[in-house]
Amino acid sequence: MTTPASPTTGVQLLDVPPELAGQRIDNFLIARLKGAPKTLIYRILRKGEVRVNKGRIKPDYRLQAGDQVRVPPLRLAERDEPAPLAQGLLERMEAAIVYEDKALIVVNKPAGIAVHGGSGVSAGVIEVFRQLRPDAKDIELVHRLDRDTSGLLMIAKKRSMLRHLHEALRGEKIVDKRYHALVRGHWPAGKKNVRAPLLKNNLRSGERMVEVNVEGKDALTEFRVLRRFGDFATLVEARPITGRTHQIRVHAKHAGHAIAGDPKYGDEDFSREIRELGGKRLFLHAAQLRVPLPDGQVLELEAPVDEMWQRSLERLND
């Protein structure tokens, strides 16, 4: 008995309609190429096999209305519909919603849940909400949070909302995002900001590491002391003025006050002491969000920390 060959597509030419202007090429292809694994899509993007208007593009290229996307022949696996996600995960994320309207969802993302699947993660927040909201055909992440960071995460249900919020985020002063972080040592009250350029490196393993480097992109984070635990630790508010990868984590380390529970940029001795108090997580939480909506209203939200965070701070205070 022979195994039937996987179906192969021919060259595909895809026109970009006005309502998809601003969408990243990878998300466009994931939505259009049903049955194509994400690994295949990212591979053809990296190799430059996808062309837009007959030219090569980067994997993070944002489409313009009227673009023509050329996709090379692909061998696709025979695939059934995605397996239903665990009911417990669906219920947990439904309960995490702090705001929802016709075009936007905001959740208080738990620590430990990735925003999207891939790299060994079967499903993340976006896959969950595509299953929870099957009628929202254009559902996309507005921005990202690291897997181990908790807090407010925006998900657009309409392309128009996604474009509006991306424009607002690029405006720097228009969207106000504030994080809480538990850091090592005594953060000086006079240290109001950290400005240091950040350079992103992709390791062979696929892991991303960021370092302060003069060749990096300008990055600014404002800090404010919220609470002290002697000279051992400080709870700070961090407001990233720029939006670089791992910005708050690297700026805190650069200032000499690493965030508790940070496996990449943290202080292992400090993190171990916090773990002994029951704090087995990264102590970085997107606590507050202020964002303009298309109708001129301003959405202001706050998200509480989880019980593990609360208990750890109570024990620190004893």
Curated annotation (Swiss-Prot):
Keywords: Isomerase, RNA-binding, rRNA processing. CDD domains: PseudoU_synth_RluA_like (cd02869), S4 (cd00165). SMART domains: S4. Transmembrane segments: none annotated. GO terms for biological process: enzyme-directed rRNA pseudouridine synthesis. One of its GO terms (molecular function) is 23S rRNA pseudouridine(955/2504/2580) synthase activity. Pfam families: PseudoU_synth_2, S4. It catalyses: uridine(955/2504/2580) in 23S rRNA = pseudouridine(955/2504/2580) in 23S rRNA. The active site is at residue 146. The keyword Hydrolase does not apply. InterPro entries: PsdUridine_synth_cat_dom_sf (IPR020103), PsdUridine_synth_RluA-like_CS (IPR006224), PsdUridine_synth_RluC/D (IPR006225), PsdUridine_synth_RsuA/RluA (IPR006145), RluA_PseudoU_synthase (IPR050188), S4_RNA-bd (IPR002942), S4_RNA-bd_sf (IPR036986). It comes from the Bacteria. Its EC number is 5.4.99.24. Residues 23-83 form the S4 RNA-binding domain. It is an enzyme of class 5 (isomerase). Responsible for synthesis of pseudouridine from uracil at positions 955, 2504 and 2580 in 23S ribosomal RNA. Belongs to the pseudouridine synthase RluA family. This is Ribosomal large subunit pseudouridine synthase C. It comes from Pseudomonas aeruginosa (strain ATCC 15692 / DSM 22644 / CIP 104116 / JCM 14847 / LMG 12228 / 1C / PRS 101 / PAO1). The lineage of its organism: Bacteria, Pseudomonadati, Pseudomonadota, Gammaproteobacteria, Pseudomonadales.
